[in-house]
């Protein structure tokens, strides 16, 4: 317990007081632009459903604004924590992630919405445990890659441990069920292990096995099989199985080049289900047109590119933990954004994943804010390390996190 409390303290002295002028403000402004645009679009997309459910058309806008404020405060707090604290706290976070995934499955604890038990009610907010667990698992895996870096390329046991951890996490996610998050988590793990030096043939074999397992899960579930077959031709059943996707495509088509205007969407008027959450991107395309779509895609592309560059800079500065953490978080956020937009446009089957930073939801917004604050912290420490003379390697060969 003493170790946990020591790790959780806000050690401003160790973080160097945080020189704000050294932060990557281009990345920070990109994040704020996405979150700000998301807030506007949530307010627009949720007007009808909010008025019908609560009598206040701006109900979800107010809540999302509060979530955004909490996310900003949590991000600032994380910026003051050194990466070494997260490196040492990786095992604790791993236990926390599994604890949350188990607790939500206990009858009477987890809240069921649309047939899925993914939330724990906490008063004003429903905690989506998968969002917290995913960040915890990525932090743990980044630390594991540092500790076992020399063994990952050639040792099967070093590769098997994270495989077992993430497979168990995927099983718990599928029990909710949350197929989309399980897919993103496993893809992130494979990508990070590859970047950490795991052999390509092991990654390839595991990828094929996971693809086979995913296929069996789809074939064995009538609901998932219907989603797969519907996505190939949603117009074959536009009023039942293909209803959501066809309404999304109609929204995107109505937007044309410059959109119908902010607030003027027709599809959000109870035609398009989940217009303010999973399918917010469709409403954005309808109201802001291709121009708005290009802007959002460009912002996410820059975020993903910059995240990978930060990881590379951290590795060059002899900060491997920061590098793996940056890569893992970037892959996770970038992949989720890509899947959400692809699903909205009918390029992938429906997964139930939100658009990071933009879709309505407190857990997703807060945890994404924390993840991006960690990315900024990686860049901050890499810049500090690059400006300092490198110490001589110790005889023990211990890798600095």
From Swiss-Prot:
Q: Of which family is this protein a member?
A: Belongs to the SEDS family. FtsW subfamily.
List, alphabetically, the InterPro entries matched.
Answer: Cell_cycle_FtsW-rel_CS, FtsW, FtsW/RodA
Top EC class of this enzyme: transferase
Q: Which domain of life is it from?
A: Bacteria
Q: How does it sit in the bilayer?
A: Multi-pass membrane protein
Pathway info: Cell wall biogenesis; peptidoglycan biosynthesis
**Any idea what job this protein has?**
Peptidoglycan polymerase that is essential for cell division.
Keywords from the UniProt entry = Cell cycle, Cell division, Cell inner membrane, Cell membrane, Cell shape, Cell wall biogenesis/degradation, Glycosyltransferase, Membrane, Peptidoglycan synthesis, Transferase, Transmembrane, Transmembrane helix
The keyword Amino-acid biosynthesis is annotated on this UniProt entry: no
Q: Which residues lie on this side of the membrane: Cytoplasmic?
A: 1-26, 87-88, 140-154, 202, 300-322, 376-401
A Gene Ontology molecular function term for this protein is: lipid-linked peptidoglycan transporter activity
**Name of one Pfam family that matches:** FTSW_RODA_SPOVE
Per the record, the gene is ftsW
**Which reaction equation describes what this protein catalyses?**
[GlcNAc-(1->4)-Mur2Ac(oyl-L-Ala-gamma-D-Glu-L-Lys-D-Ala-D-Ala)](n)-di-trans,octa-cis-undecaprenyl diphosphate + beta-D-GlcNAc-(1->4)-Mur2Ac(oyl-L-Ala-gamma-D-Glu-L-Lys-D-Ala-D-Ala)-di-trans,octa-cis-undecaprenyl diphosphate = [GlcNAc-(1->4)-Mur2Ac(oyl-L-Ala-gamma-D-Glu-L-Lys-D-Ala-D-Ala)](n+1)-di-trans,octa-cis-undecaprenyl diphosphate + di-trans,octa-cis-undecaprenyl diphosphate + H(+)
Location in the cell reads:
Cell inner membrane
Q: Which residues lie on this side of the membrane: Periplasmic?
A: 48-65, 110-118, 176-180, 224-278, 344-354
| GO process terms (BP) | cell wall organization; FtsZ-dependent cytokinesis; peptidoglycan biosynthetic process; regulation of cell shape
Give the EC number(s) listed in the UniProt record.
2.4.99.28
Q: What is its main location?
A: membrane
UniProt GO cellular component terms? cell division site; plasma membrane
User: Where, by residue number, does the polypeptide cross the bilayer?
Assistant: 27-47, 66-86, 89-109, 119-139, 155-175, 181-201, 203-223, 279-299, 323-343, 355-375
**What is the name of this protein?**
Probable peptidoglycan glycosyltransferase FtsW
């Amino acid at each position: 317990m003493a170790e946990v409390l020591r790790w959780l303290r806000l050690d401003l002295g160790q973080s160097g007081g945080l020189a704000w002028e050294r932060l990557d403000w281009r990345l920070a402004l990109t994040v704020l632009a996405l979150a700000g645009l998301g807030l506007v679009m949530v307010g627009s997309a949720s007007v009808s459903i909010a008025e019908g459910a609560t009598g206040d058309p701006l109900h979800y806008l107010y809540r999302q604004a509060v979530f955004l404020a909490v996310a900003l405060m949590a991000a600032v707090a994380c910026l003051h924590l050194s990466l070494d604290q997260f490196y040492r706290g990786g095992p604790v976070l791993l236990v926390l992630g599994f604890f949350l995934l188990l607790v939500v499955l206990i009858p009477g604890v987890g809240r069921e919405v649309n047939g899925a038990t993914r939330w724990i009610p906490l008063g004003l907010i429903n905690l989506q445990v998968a969002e917290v667990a995913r960040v915890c698992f990525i932090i743990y895996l980044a630390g594991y890659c540092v500790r076992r870096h020399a063994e990952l390329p050639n040792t099967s046991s070093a590769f098997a441990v994270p495989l077992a951890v993430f497979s168990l996490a995927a099983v718990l996610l599928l029990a909710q069920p949350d197929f989309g998050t399980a897919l993103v988590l496993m893809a992130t793990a494979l990508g990070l292990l590859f970047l950490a030096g795991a052999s390509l043939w092991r990654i390839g074999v595991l990828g094929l096995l996971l693809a086979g397992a995913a296929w069996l899960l789809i074939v064995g579930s009538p609901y998932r099989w219907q989603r797969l077959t519907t996505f190939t031709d949603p117009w074959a059943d536009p009023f039942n199985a293909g209803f959501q996707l066809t309404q999304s495509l109609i929204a995107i088509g109505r937007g044309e080049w410059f959109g119908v205007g902010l607030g003027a969407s027709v599809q959000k008027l109870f035609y398009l289900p989940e217009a303010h959450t999973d399918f917010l991107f469709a409403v954005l395309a309808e109201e802001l047109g291709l121009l708005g779509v290009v802007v959002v895609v460009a912002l996410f592309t820059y975020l993903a590119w910059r995240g990978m560059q930060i990881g590379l800079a951290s590795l060059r500065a002899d900060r491997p933990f920061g590098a793996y953490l940056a890569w893992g978080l970037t892959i996770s956020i970038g992949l989720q954004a890509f899947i959400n937009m692809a699903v909205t446009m009918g390029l992938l089957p429906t997964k139930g994943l939100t658009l990071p930073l933009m879709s309505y939801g407190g857990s997703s917004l807060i945890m994404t804010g924390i993840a991006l604050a960690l990315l900024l912290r990686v860049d901050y420490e890499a810049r500090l390390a690059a400006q300092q003379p490198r110490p001589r390697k110790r005889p023990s060969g211990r890798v600095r996190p």
